């Protein structure tokens, strides 16, 4: 069973994910249909960032996954050389 701290951290992660999802969905799907002079537009970044932010995040994720795989492979290779 999860401890109280685990539950709080899990709830926090779910809450942050829901906030980001709601913000991004509103930004990308609903905002284009609202008049550009409406006051709600000042709470959102320009639309170009709607593509750039997920793209940069995806590239960083791929970079870290690649670095992790490289690290594990090099570490495994060193251990097999020591064993021989």
From Swiss-Prot:
Keywords: Endoplasmic reticulum, Membrane, Transmembrane, Transmembrane helix. GO terms for molecular function: enzyme regulator activity. InterPro entries: DPM2. It is a multi-pass membrane protein. Pathway: Protein modification; protein glycosylation. GO terms for biological process: dolichol phosphate mannose biosynthetic process; GPI anchor biosynthetic process; protein glycosylation. GO terms for cellular component: dolichol-phosphate-mannose synthase complex; glycosylphosphatidylinositol-N-acetylglucosaminyltransferase (GPI-GnT) complex. The chain crosses the membrane at residues 11-31, 49-69. It is found in: Endoplasmic reticulum membrane. Component of the dolichol-phosphate mannose (DPM) synthase complex composed of DPM1, DPM2 and DPM3; in the complex interacts directly with DPM3. Component of the glycosylphosphatidylinositol-N-acetylglucosaminyltransferase (GPI-GnT) complex composed at least by PIGA, PIGC, PIGH, PIGP, PIGQ, PIGY and DPM2. Interacts with PIGA, PIGC and PIGQ. Belongs to the DPM2 family. PANTHER family: DOLICHOL PHOSPHATE-MANNOSE BIOSYNTHESIS REGULATORY PROTEIN. Regulates the biosynthesis of dolichol phosphate-mannose. Regulatory subunit of the dolichol-phosphate mannose (DPM) synthase complex; essential for the ER localization and stable expression of DPM1. Part of the glycosylphosphatidylinositol-N-acetylglucosaminyltransferase (GPI-GnT) complex that catalyzes the transfer of N-acetylglucosamine from UDP-N-acetylglucosamine to phosphatidylinositol and participates in the first step of GPI biosynthesis. May act by regulating the GPI-GNT complex. This is Dolichol phosphate-mannose biosynthesis regulatory protein.
């Amino acid at each position: 069973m999860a401890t109280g701290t685990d539950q709080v951290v899990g709830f926090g992660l779910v809450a942050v994910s829901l906030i980001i999802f709601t913000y991004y969905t509103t930004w990308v799907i609903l905002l284009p249909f609202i008049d550009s002079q409406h006051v709600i537009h000042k709470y959102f970044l320009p639309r170009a960032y709607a593509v750039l932010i997920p793209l940069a995040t995806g590239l960083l994720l791929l970079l870290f996954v690649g670095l992790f795989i490289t690290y594990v492979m090099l570490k495994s290779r060193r251990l097999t050389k020591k064993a021989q």
